[in-house]
């Protein structure tokens, strides 16, 4: 068994014993599952892609996609929260000045601190180049002013990788990337958003009011930050697609088990043709979505251009989840409404998945633009 298989097995056990039983409680309490993130950190899930030199596991993207499906099957919101902290640890380890990385990566790996990436604003979502949070040069570094919204983990994150405009009107060319410490003056946290079925995601926002960032806290200067963000978004699109596959796979498992036990008109539901055809359709679409994820994940791990493949994987998987989760919930009848089943949370998760890291409409635009130069099937 290699390290990736070992971590996948640990993730499966963690999902079974911690996330599945905990998710209904976290939703009822409307909170991020800090204690579960700490427990996940203890088995290496916050260090999946973090280099071994920093205390991480140094594994590849394909393992990350597998783990995302395993954990997403248990709860979308928790998995988003966990992966966002992991992403900040991995980014700092790879791209931050050495002293900054040495100071902060261990805190993220242990789960003592949460991380988040702050791109989105109230008036700038998929149109990333339209952000208006400003970074103004000062003698001591950079002054940050503005507001971010719809940020995963913003309700509690202590470390923020933030994107800000350095020169109004320059669009993506003027955007820089900074590390922000939420404990310092000038950072004002807004109340967490109330998202039906997805409180574990910790979505919210914050304001920057004269926050001072040092020069060494600029992770990417203008001209590089926008490109770095787009590379990260490709990875996010694929693991979100994988999480959608996990949610549908779990719903299919629950419905299949129920169909063996529940009898209707004197026989199990599985013996009714119409009922089992619904599950067959879901299983077929799930298999196709998994193949798209595998293709995109392989390209990301190889360092190849994955824009088209990531967009296709996310578009298909999110639409598949939005289409099949209601079908599988209907296959359960009223039983599917009970909160210990995942259907309510997964339906909400699928809707969130359709918006984050590029709405489905934006993905269609990207696919339309990219397919003209895409490789042929004979020359992938």
What would you call each of these model-derived segments?
Residues 2, 7, 73, 189-287, ...:
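Glycine-rich beta->alpha junctions and the first turn(s) of the following alpha-helix
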Residues 20-28, 263-267, 283-316, 329-337:
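C-terminal helix-coil-helix/basic helical segment that borders enzyme active sites and/or dimer interfaces
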Residues 42-112, 153-159, 300, 349:
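Internal helix-loop-helix
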Residues 73, 85, 124, 149-154, ...:
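Glycine-rich phosphate/pyrophosphate-binding beta-alpha loops
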Residues 87, 332-380:
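Glycine-rich phosphate/cofactor-binding loops in nucleotide/flavin-utilizing enzymes
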Residues 111-120:
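A short, Trp-centered hydrophobic/proline-enriched beta-strand micro-motif
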Residues 133-136:
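A structural signal for short hydrophobic beta-strand segments in well-ordered beta-sheet cores
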Residues 145-189:
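A short core secondary-structure module
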